[in-house]
């Protein structure tokens, strides 16, 4: 209704100033005008604006709290602006925006979160009140858009002056026609309409023209290239933007508008472009026809030798450059005589100003950072670098290397340039083509032939430097050896451990690995690489590049060894390093015959004690060095000249490991892949989790180690008959018979466990290290190391595996198989390791004395018939044939088998655990058809995560990455889709809001239920990004009770104008945005704010220290999320002198610091601590490492003279530990200089080690008070928690365990290195709305029931949630179940129905069978505990079986010789 009233008002209103029109001019003091009669609470009020003339204002819509009549229903308050709030979420109280002229960025805000304020300095930006920090946050409009407060949106600047910040307008005496209307300027005493090109750079109208007299501009104004007077405030801008602009015409001459900033047109003469530029853009630079200077030759430019400036700008000037020097006479100016006359008609000095277009008589006439020099404004201080200009210039070639010509001055370059892969250029002249492809090398200098001779006037191109008049190319620091660009973070590196994962350190830069090879060690040994360049660290500050012959000696260089890494047989070195005999990890230039790097060094070929396993042999490599290489029976003498190709098993493929470039154990590989013994990886598995898992079992048989096996083809009974005797296969060779047969038969009463030494080690080289002990990613827990003593490698029948299993996994080279499998050499297939089992329900009968005598007689008879054969026994050793229940082998006993799972006998696919007892079963089971089956309160349903596109996930993400064609979503890999938002306005602007009765405000039309500009149908944020949905109100309907309604959004989104949820793209606590976090981490100097890396700066501009769990060290306080030095104050009596504020430590000695007022030097040492005092000072001097402090009322005062007390500098507040110190700082610079890896602590003048992010080195992990308790599945092999307060989440709840590479399981988030539920990661008091799946909703649904891209609307909750939400049922009065089909009762009752195995969970109590200790919730999924195994969707307690390696056991020794094990 309000919109209709406003629309009628606008239609009736005429152009006269007396008729009130929204946005029209008015006289201040005019009475308010009621809108729609007296029954409404809206009226028009005349208020002043930034650009209103004196005594004038603009009509603005206002609202008054009017009581609704009793007979007429109240009309809900609506926003009269074009962007309307959806009617369903309209607040009960009016929401009229009022302008706050005092709003400033990063200051406290106390207005409605949905009202935006104009930025006082940048018309193309606006301020928004952040809901979390309650501070103003700066946002940016789209390109070529300006913010309009009245409309609360970014619009195309039709009347730009109304949107500009307030400027100082001259009085009538300075400008006779200052009363010209908007959009016009005074010229020759007349008001002339101006075009867009005549406006100032900030969009404001010029004050006057300066066509004939350049000095006619009033004070505080300057003459632009368009010959108009613009205010000096139009040149003010933030760091990083020289001049704010909207279109090219608003920039000074010679500049273009790029991203709302005026930038200089640069002449690129070398094959280098800005980072991320395209190769095509670089190629166009060399096309003469398309030269940006219209084919102007460099030789035609006037040359002038550099000259020094006589005056240097004062330190107080702020660097804000505005215009770029344009080389004069680039084009023929004879045809444009007006421009020539305008440039030089005033005086001879005006022509010499060149492209600056600014004449002056004093420094006040010039912009900031400029000085008046010979009648022209010249640059005095370079921008960003804050360095004084030393040389003037007119072209790029007048400046030195790493400088560019900027406003007529040579300034250091601050834009990082990247070298594009060089190409051979063909130079043409008179149809004669000459190609220069040969390199000219003089000594160690590779000559850059583009410049014949270099000097101060003729400089070398980029990436080259002048040496004795010759341009020598610099080493390729920015480009890696594999052709990829170096990483920008970190800036420098000394070792590869300083670089992120999947990268290494080259020439002080971190270089990423290629996908097909990790580093130079993976290259073929046979490849000929005669010369390589390596870096040799000769000091802490300089590096030299030295040419080394790759085929030279292999002696260990101490510079290649890790200084802090120690190694032994139990603690191996990182990949690509070899453990030396001295216990250091060194990088050697040798490789094993299979191409891998040796694990350890050894002494001689006959001594293998230093090798990590029996599969490694000490081998002589390159006739000089002994090292342990994996190759059974290998004897190599001499140098290695070829590489043996390492292949995965037939039919398998290689994938990248979870971290690093090569694997050592299978835990380094993503499941279900395994690592073969040659350092490569292979799959070869028949199925993956999507085709064979606990929640999706094989159609026939069982799922073992990730592949489907048959369980009924060749198997006999499910349980092995313990009374059946086994005999040796007569077809076996006689060489397999042991010498202890007779001894064993005579001493059959004594039982012993089998020993590995009884088995020929040469028959199976993989008999050991199936389950090696090691840290996460390199081994298994210690309690699993004895599986080799329990499991047996049973041989099959020559056709299939033992126990009736079918396998299609072919053994790899060297008879290798994944952990838990062994290679059946008869069929060359990988078969499962088995347990010898007997059923406790059918135990082996005790043999009486008569039965024992009969048994001995049978054995003696068999021994007489076959004197050399083994006695009949049930042994855990391999049987020569596998006949099962129908074996055709004569005299061959059934080999050990595993239990065959029976067919499903319970409803829902479950399995029976036994028969009922008088119609009753144990807790958690019910009697169905005389069988005990798992019982459920509701129909079980396995929850399978669906991707945003609706498809199923293919597996979990590995370090946030997925295979090609898949993307990581919620820590699972989903197929990549190209979906678009169906709600897109044609012009790409943001929708103003929802339509009300199918109508919108002026300038907007209703399209698809939304108000869009013109015929727009999109929902976009002010920065151009897509909105995910509408803001969620804190209450709706009668639940509000007259309370002010607030709006909020999900994590990572904020509620903006129009009540829509937009992504957060700024730092909530202030600071500049660097980019998104990498594995939850940020580089040094930046802090994590949300999911962004923000600059960690203190209020004084200094870089703060990162806090630890929100706590700072002594002497520091938490400010803007970082630790900043606390304020220092002291009296004049204890201060040591005035603080200059310049030089090292502000001019104060070590142990002192400038106070908060920058007046006195106050002590920062703990001088009151007697342990820090060493004694009185002698003549004001103290020993090295101590500082004198004149403590008031000191007992050392004699005759009124205070000699001073010497205080230890180690007592300085905030100083690092002594173990992290390296010495004193070099005080030559203000910040102090320290060796690489150390930072100067200026208050004490001591160098402390720098805190940087680095990879965890093996063997150097933090020492814990006790060994971790490993009790989770192997692929989640991490300690569950370390205990103490550190294991708690932010809300006090216990974490699920530590994060791995910043990642957690499905349904969890990484918080301070701990995996916590998403709800525990939200600030206290923040409203949250939960989706049926438990995820936090990102926003509310749009009025038409839709959401943004990647989300779907849950109509019953009116929330935008991730796709694949389970169906929900509303809770009715009296219904205490709150039932939904996914057993998720968060929105219903407090009762909790058990969830099946494989379903998502948050607590152990949610899983079925948890009360009996059979299940647990791990990584957000219900899993069986170690004492149980999975049957369908439930857990069944493992049975206890007796394991007998010798069936001939006397009854008296049964209790001592049997052992129990759970399977």
Swiss-Prot record:
Taxonomic lineage of the native organism: Eukaryota, Metazoa, Ecdysozoa, Nematoda, Chromadorea
Protein name: Chitin binding domain (ChtBD2) containing chtb-1
One matching Pfam family: CC
Name of encoding gene: chtb-1
Keywords assigned by UniProt, alphabetized: Chitin-binding, Disulfide bond, Signal
Source organism of the structure: Caenorhabditis elegans
Top-level taxon: Eukaryota
Signal peptide (from-to): 1-17
A cellular-component GO term for this protein: extracellular region
Chitin-binding type-2 domain residues: 94-164
């Amino acid at each position: 209704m309000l919109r209709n009233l406003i629309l009628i008002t606008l239609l009736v209103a005429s152009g006269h100033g007396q008729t009130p029109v929204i946005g029209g001019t008015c006289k201040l003091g005019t009475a308010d005008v009621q809108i729609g009669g007296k029954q409404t609470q809206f009226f028009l009020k005349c208020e002043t604006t930034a650009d209103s003339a004196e005594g004038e204002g603009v009509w603005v819509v206002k609202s008054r709290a009017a009581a609704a009549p009793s007979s007429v229903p109240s009309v809900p308050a609506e926003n009269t602006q074009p962007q309307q709030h959806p009617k369903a979420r309209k607040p009960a109280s009016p929401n009229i925006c009022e302008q706050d002229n005092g709003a400033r960025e990063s200051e406290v805000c106390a207005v409605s979160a949905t009202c935006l304020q104009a930025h006082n300095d940048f018309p193309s930006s606006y301020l928004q009140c952040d809901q979390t920090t309650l501070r103003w946050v700066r946002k940016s409009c789209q390109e070529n858009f300006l913010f309009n407060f009245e409309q609360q949106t970014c619009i195309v600047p039709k009347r730009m002056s109304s949107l500009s910040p307030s400027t100082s307008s001259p009085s009538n005496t300075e400008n006779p026609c200052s009363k010209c209307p908007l959009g016009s300027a005074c010229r020759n005493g007349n008001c002339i309409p101006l075009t867009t090109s005549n406006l100032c750079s900030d969009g404001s109208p010029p004050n006057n023209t300066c066509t004939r007299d350049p000095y006619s501009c009033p004070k505080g104004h300057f003459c632009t290239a368009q010959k108009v007077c613009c205010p000096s405030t139009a040149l003010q801008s933030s760091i990083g933007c020289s001049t704010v602009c909207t279109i090219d015409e608003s920039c000074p001459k010679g500049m273009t508008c790029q991203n709302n900033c005026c930038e200089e047109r640069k002449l690129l003469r070398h094959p280098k472009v800005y980072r991320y530029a395209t190769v095509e853009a670089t190629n166009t630079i060399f096309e003469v026809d398309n030269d940006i200077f219209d084919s102007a030759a460099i030789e035609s430019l006037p040359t002038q030798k550099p000259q020094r400036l006589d005056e240097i700008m004062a330190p107080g000037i702020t660097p804000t450059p505005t215009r770029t020097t344009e080389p004069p006479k680039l084009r023929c100016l004879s045809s444009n005589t007006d421009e020539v006359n305008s440039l030089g008609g005033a005086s001879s000095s005006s022509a010499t100003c060149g492209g600056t277009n600014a004449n002056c008589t004093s420094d006040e006439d010039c912009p900031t950072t400029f000085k008046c020099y010979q009648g022209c404004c010249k640059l005095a201080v370079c921008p960003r670098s804050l360095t004084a200009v030393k040389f003037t210039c007119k072209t790029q070639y007048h400046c030195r290397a790493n400088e560019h010509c900027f406003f007529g001055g040579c300034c250091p370059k601050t834009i990082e340039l990247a070298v594009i892969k060089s190409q051979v250029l063909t130079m043409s002249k008179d149809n004669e083509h000459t190609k220069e492809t040969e390199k000219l090398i003089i000594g160690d200098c590779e000559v850059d032939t583009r410049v014949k001779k270099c000097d101060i006037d003729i400089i070398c191109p980029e990436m080259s430097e002048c040496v004795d008049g010759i341009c020598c190319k610099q080493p390729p620091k920015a480009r890696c050896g594999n052709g990829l660009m170096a990483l920008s973070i970190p800036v420098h590196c000394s070792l590869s451990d300083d670089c992120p994962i999947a990268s290494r350190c080259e020439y002080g830069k971190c270089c990423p690995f290629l996908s097909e090879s990790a580093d130079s060690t993976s290259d073929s040994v046979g490849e000929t690489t005669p010369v390589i360049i390596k870096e040799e660290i000769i000091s802490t500050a300089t590096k030299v590049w030295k040419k080394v012959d790759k085929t030279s000696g292999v002696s260990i260089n101490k510079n290649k060894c890790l200084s802090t890494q120690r190694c032994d047989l139990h603690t191996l070195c990182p990949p690509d390093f070899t453990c030396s005999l001295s216990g250091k990890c060194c990088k050697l230039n040798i490789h094993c015959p299979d191409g891998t790097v040796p694990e350890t060094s050894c002494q001689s070929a006959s001594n293998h004690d230093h090798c990590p396993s029996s599969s490694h042999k000490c081998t002589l490599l390159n006739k000089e060095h002994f090292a342990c290489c994996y190759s059974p029976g290998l004897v190599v003498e001499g140098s290695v000249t070829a590489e043996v190709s390492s292949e995965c098993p037939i039919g398998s493929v290689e994938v990248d490991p979870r971290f690093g470039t090569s694997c050592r154990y299978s835990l380094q590989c993503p499941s279900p892949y395994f690592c073969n013994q040659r350092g490569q990886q292979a799959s070869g598995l028949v199925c993956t989790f999507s085709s064979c898992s606990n929640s999706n079992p094989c159609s026939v048989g069982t799922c073992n180690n990730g592949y489907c096996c048959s369980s009924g083809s060749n198997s006999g009974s499910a349980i092995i008959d313990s009374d059946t005797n086994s005999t040796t296969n007569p077809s076996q060779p006689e060489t397999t018979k042991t010498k202890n047969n007779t001894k064993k038969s005579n001493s059959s009463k004594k039982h012993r466990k089998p020993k590995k030494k009884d088995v020929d080690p040469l028959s199976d080289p993989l008999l050991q290290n199936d389950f090696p002990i090691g840290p996460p990613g390199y081994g298994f827990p210690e309690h699993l190391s004895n599986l080799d003593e329990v499991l047996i490698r049973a041989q099959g029948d020559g056709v299939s595996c033992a126990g009736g299993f079918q396998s299609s996994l072919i053994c790899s080279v060297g008879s290798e198989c994944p952990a838990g499998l062994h290679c059946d050499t008869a069929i060359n297939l990988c078969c499962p390791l088995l347990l010898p089992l007997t059923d406790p329900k059918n135990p082996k009968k005790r043999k009486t004395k008569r039965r024992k005598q009969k048994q001995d007689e049978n054995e003696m008879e068999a021994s007489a018939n076959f004197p050399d054969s083994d006695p009949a026994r049930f042994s855990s050793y391999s049987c020569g044939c596998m006949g099962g229940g129908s074996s055709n082998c004569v005299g061959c006993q059934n080999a050990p088998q595993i239990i065959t799972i029976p067919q499903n006998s319970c409803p829902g696919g479950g399995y029976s655990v036994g028969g009922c007892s008088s119609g009753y079963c144990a807790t958690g089971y019910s009697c169905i058809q005389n069988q005990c089956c798992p019982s459920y309160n509701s129909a079980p349903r396995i929850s399978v995560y669906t991707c945003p596109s609706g498809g199923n996930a293919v597996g979990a993400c590995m370090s946030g990455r997925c295979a090609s064609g898949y993307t990581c979503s919620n820590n699972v890999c989903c197929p990549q889709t190209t979906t678009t938002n169906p709600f897109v306005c044609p012009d790409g602007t943001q929708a103003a809001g929802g339509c009300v009765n199918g109508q919108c405000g002026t300038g907007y039309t209703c399209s698809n239920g939304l108000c869009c500009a013109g015929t727009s149908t999109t929902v976009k944020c002010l920065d151009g990004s897509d909105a995910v949905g509408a803001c969620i109100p804190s209450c709706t309907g009668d639940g509000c009770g007259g309370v002010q309604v607030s709006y909020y959004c999900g994590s990572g989104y904020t509620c903006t104008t129009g009540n829509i949820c937009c992504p957060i793209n700024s730092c909530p606590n202030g600071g500049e945005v660097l980019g998104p976090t990498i594995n939850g981490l940020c580089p040094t100097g930046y802090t994590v704010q949300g999911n962004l890396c923000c600059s960690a700066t203190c209020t004084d501009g200094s870089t703060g220290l990162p806090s630890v769990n929100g706590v700072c060290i002594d002497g520091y306080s938490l400010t803007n999320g970082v630790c900043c030095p606390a304020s220092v104050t002291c009296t004049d009596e204890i201060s040591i002198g005035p603080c200059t504020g310049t030089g090292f430590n502000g001019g104060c000695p070590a142990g002192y610091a400038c106070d908060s007022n920058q007046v006195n030097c106050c002590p920062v040492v703990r001088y009151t601590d007697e342990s820090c005092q060493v004694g009185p000072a002698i003549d004001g001097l103290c020993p090295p490492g101590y500082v004198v402090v004149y403590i008031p009322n000191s007992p050392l005062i004699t005759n009124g003279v205070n000699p001073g007390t010497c205080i230890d500098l180690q007592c300085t507040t905030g100083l690092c530990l002594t173990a992290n110190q390296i010495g004193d700082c070099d005080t030559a610079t203000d910040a102090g200089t320290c060796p690489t890896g150390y930072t100067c602590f200026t208050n004490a003048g001591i160098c402390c080690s720098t805190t940087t992010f680095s990879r965890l080195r093996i063997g150097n992990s933090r020492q814990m008070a006790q060994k971790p308790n490993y009790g989770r599945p192997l692929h989640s092999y991490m300690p569950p928690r370390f205990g103490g307060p550190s294991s708690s989440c932010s809300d006090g709840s216990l974490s699920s365990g530590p994060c791995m590479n910043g990642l957690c399981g499905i349904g969890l988030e990484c918080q301070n290195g701990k995996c916590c539920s998403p709800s525990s990661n939200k600030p206290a008091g923040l409203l949250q709305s939960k989706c049926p799946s438990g995820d936090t909703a990102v926003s509310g649904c749009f009025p038409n029931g839709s959401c943004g891209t990647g989300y779907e609307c849950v109509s019953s909750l009116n929330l935008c949630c991730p796709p694949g939400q389970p169906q929900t049922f509303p809770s009715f009065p009296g219904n205490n179940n709150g039932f939904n089909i996914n057993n998720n009762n968060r929105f219903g009752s407090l009762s909790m129905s058990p969830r099946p195995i494989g379903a998502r969970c948050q607590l152990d109590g949610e899983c079925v069978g948890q009360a009996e200790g059979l299940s647990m919730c791990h990584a957000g999924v219900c899993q069986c505990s170690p004492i149980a195994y999975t049957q369908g969707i439930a857990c069944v307690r493992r049975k206890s079986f007796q394991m007998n390696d010798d069936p001939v056991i006397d009854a008296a020794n049964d209790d001592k010789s049997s052992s129990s094990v759970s399977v």
